[in-house]
């Protein structure tokens, strides 16, 4: 087994040992959810947020914004736009449940962190056509952070203290890993919301300087 496969196996064991409820469940870590299904019942959702998800076991089909995606264990899906979606956990059963985890992303945090990237990287990625929804293969570092969030399910009292740092690191890894080429164009400086966030960031950095 590869390192990634070993990590996925560990994450499955950790998640099942926490015995998450059936369906989509919130956790003490803000924005972090568990997904456990034992049937193929299709579900619709419109979360109004951008998010990243990883499948630990099973296969999932997703229809988002008129586009169809299919991805399985060891793959992730990043949705950079708040769009209605319909998904189905394929072949899920009590014996072989579908398991995945997801994290709602904070656009302001992404924009703030993107400002620390080399300008050359930002310009190169900005030339790519925006793609708000895409499947990708996670890095070991990214899976490690998600495993840390899963382990917090056993110590929920520590989630308010530890989860924010882990979640911020996940945002950083998404901007620096294989997702960067598609994620960064969605954060272009021309976006109105980005302008506001950048203005706030400038004020924070320069509040003590004379006008």
Give residue spans per PLM region.
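Alpha-helix N-cap/helix-initiation sites
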Residues: 45, 159-164
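Aromatic/histidine-rich interaction motifs
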Residues: 115-144
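A short, Lys/Arg-enriched amphipathic alpha-helix from helix-turn-helix/homeodomain DNA-binding modules
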Residues: 135-154, 163-167, 171-175, 179-211
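A short, N-terminal "cap"/entry segment at the start of jelly-roll beta-barrel domains
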Residues: 1-28, 33-34, 41-42, 126-130, ...
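N-terminal regulatory/effector-sensing and dimerization cores
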Residues: 24-122
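Active-site oxyanion-binding pockets that recognize sulfate/phosphate
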Residues: 96, 153-160
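A short secondary-structure junction signal
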Residues: 113-116, 147, 161
């Amino acid at each position: 087994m590869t390192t990634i496969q070993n990590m996925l196996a560990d994450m499955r064991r950790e998640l099942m040992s926490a015995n998450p409820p059936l369906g989509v469940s919130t956790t003490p870590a803000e924005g972090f959810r568990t997904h456990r299904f034992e049937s193929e019942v299709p579900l619709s959702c419109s979360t109004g947020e951008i998010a990243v998800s990883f499948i630990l076991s099973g296969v999932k089909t997703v229809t988002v914004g008129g586009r169809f995606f299919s991805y399985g264990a060891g793959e992730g899906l990043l949705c950079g736009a708040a769009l209605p979606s319909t998904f189905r956990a394929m072949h899920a059963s009590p014996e072989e449940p579908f398991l995945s985890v997801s994290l709602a992303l904070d656009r302001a945090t992404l924009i703030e962190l993107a400002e620390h990237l080399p300008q050359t990287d930002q310009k190169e990625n900005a030339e790519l056509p925006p793609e708000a929804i895409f499947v990708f293969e996670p890095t070991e570092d990214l899976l490690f952070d998600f495993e840390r969030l899963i382990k917090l399910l056993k110590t929920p009292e520590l989630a308010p203290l530890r989860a924010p740092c882990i979640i911020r690191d996940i945002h950083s890894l998404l901007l620096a890993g294989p997702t960067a080429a598609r994620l960064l164009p969605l954060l272009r400086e021309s976006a109105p919301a980005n302008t506001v966030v950048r203005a706030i960031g400038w004020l924070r950095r320069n509040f003590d300087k004379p006008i």
